[in-house]
Amino acid sequence: MKLKTVRSAVLSSLFASQVLGKIIPAANKRDDDSNSKFVKLPFHKLYGDSLENVGSDKKPEVRLLKRADGYEEIIITNQQSFYSVDLEVGTPPQNVTVLVDTGSSDLWIMGSDNPYCSSNSMGSSRRRVIDKRDDSSSGGSLINDINPFGWLTGTGSAIGPTATGLGGGSGTATQSVPASEATMDCQQYGTFSTSGSSTFRSNNTYFSISYGDGTFASGTFGTDVLDLSDLNVTGLSFAVANETNSTMGVLGIGLPELEVTYSGSTASHSGKAYKYDNFPIVLKNSGAIKSNTYSLYLNDSDAMHGTILFGAVDHSKYTGTLYTIPIVNTLSASGFSSPIQFDVTINGIGISDSGSSNKTLTTTKIPALLDSGTTLTYLPQTVVSMIATELGAQYSSRIGYYVLDCPSDDSMEIVFDFGGFHINAPLSSFILSTGTTCLLGIIPTSDDTGTILGDSFLTNAYVVYDLENLEISMAQARYNTTSENIEIITSSVPSAVKAPGYTNTWSTSASIVTGGNIFTVNSSQTASFSGNLTTSTASATSTSSKRNVGDHIVPSLPLTLISLLFAFI
């Protein structure tokens, strides 16, 4: 059973004003050109079943257990992956660690008075305030109504300020926090004391976010000084969660339209939704970077490090040509005039066996969310069934996965077509193995709105996120290179070219149709490709004119990647 994430945003008042964040170079700016307009954040890859037991050596694995009734039970461990960065917040600085997430846009950190911390346990005498409100005037939550994530659902509301600035609506109620729940070791990733910082300023805007696994965070927005990597950031709005059962906060670097002040129900309560300057925008407005862009490089699945690079692209970390495709708006029918998340169009999916045997499964256009906060890959049920059939995999209702013979080598690849260029992912990227038993780590979804390209896909791609032009540039990732060839992004991504099918994007949902051909290029639509691409006229059979990814690479920047995996049984 898939654990679905549920996120909701609750805002008690609008920010009083927009604060322009500033970046002050730290003393140890950079060893290279101090005038370079890019920012590198380092990350590690870590794995585990929870944030409390993560480690760099805990790779995803499948274990077989013999039950008393004679049946074998499959236990899947270490399945979830995240990225984390270390921050110093406040004056004097307090150390906290947060997860980096391209699928959200707000920064929140854990408060030191969190009652779920074992050090703060006061049993049932420690109570939390739950805002109660009359929804009759709001028409419900905008987030709930639009279901912006497809596979995510939730509720949100903006609550008018009271005398305290935190309550609202028709009153408040209290709920106790049992001592049995106050068990978190909050010192592991750090907490933040607002009273311990002379520079913290609250703006009395209430924040709340919740997740489908039962975790949540609530608190108040404010501003303070942040130090991360070689930067000192001032004026960045973030939330301090004085109540959360999640052991780590989140640094959201997504589109500003995904901020809780915009995609929550602020419009229903105040008459307008608004966006504030989140972390990537603050970097640009302060002059630290020239464009609101960043490049993500996960390296291969066995690597312990990866990088994210704000405001630049590293040509040493990818091979072939960097192709650009538009971000598509999957929520236009819900009233959004522009995209709020990183959805792109998959124009086709196929399977290749070392290029000697290629088969196209479908050329139906599918919208897919690029999400570094999701470990596995989720595709429409019909497509997963096609892949399973080609691999000879059988679905096990008891396990909830397709079971297949473990591949003997990496010759088999799943090929994703994006507007006429390919990202090839070896089958091993999607395999969960015990050594003798293998599971297909591609999860079927009920329709195309739930398609997610998670880390198992993103490991194979170098991805540049252009938040200003609403475009994504991708190329095949090059692994374990120590060289750098960094180029600043000013307006458009350097060396990137529009994909030949740039305008051939998803617009409406459609049934998945089998067949087609992604391994040849129609002669009437031949585009100029750099690299060693052979073109030919499309035919009914998938004769190979496979795109060669060439020999260019893009370097990215370091962050701390944390992998957690939930058992889907």
Curated annotation (Swiss-Prot):
Catalytic activity field: Hydrolyzes various precursor proteins with Arg or Lys in P1, and commonly Arg or Lys also in P2. The P3 amino acid is usually non-polar, but otherwise additional basic amino acids are favorable in both non-prime and prime positions
Leader sequence residues: 1-21
EC numbers: 3.4.23.41
Induction: Positively regulated by cell integrity signaling through MPK1 in response to cell wall perturbation.
Glycosylation (residues): 95, 203, 232, 242, 245, 299, 358, 480, 522, 532
Membrane-topology annotation of the record: Lipid-anchor; GPI-anchor
InterPro entries cross-referenced by the UniProt entry: Aspartic_peptidase_A1 (IPR001461), Aspartic_peptidase_AS (IPR001969), PEPTIDASE_A1 (IPR033121), Peptidase_aspartic_dom_sf (IPR021109), SAP-like (IPR033876)
Superkingdom in the source lineage: Eukaryota
GO cellular component: extracellular region; fungal-type cell wall; plasma membrane; side of membrane
UniProt modification remark: The zymogen is transported to the periplasm, where the propeptide is removed and the enzyme is further subjected to an internal, autocatalytic cleavage to generate an alpha/beta two-subunit endopeptidase. The proteolytic processing at the cell surface is regulated by the environmental pH. Extensively N-glycosylated.
Any single GO BP term: fungal-type cell wall organization
Positions bearing the site annotation: Cleavage: 128-129, 144-145
Peptidase A1 domain segment(s): 83-475
Active site: 101, 371
Entry keyword Cell wall biogenesis/degradation: no
Keywords (A to Z) from UniProt: Aspartyl protease, Autocatalytic cleavage, Cell membrane, Cleavage on pair of basic residues, Disulfide bond, Glycoprotein, GPI-anchor, Hydrolase, Lipoprotein, Membrane, Protease, Signal, Zymogen
Residues that make up the propeptide removed upon maturation: 22-67, 549-569
Intracellular or extracellular location(s): Cell membrane
GPI-anchor amidated asparagine lipid modification positions: 548
Main location: membrane
GO molecular function, one term: aspartic-type endopeptidase activity
Family named by the database record: Belongs to the peptidase A1 family.
Oligomer and partners: Consists of an alpha and a beta subunit, which are maintained together by a disulfide bond.
PANTHER family: ASPARTIC-TYPE ENDOPEPTIDASE (PTHR47966:SF65), BETA-SITE APP-CLEAVING ENZYME, ISOFORM A-RELATED (PTHR47966)
Other noteworthy facts: Present with 5000 molecules/cell in log phase SD medium.
Protein's name in the database: Aspartic proteinase 3
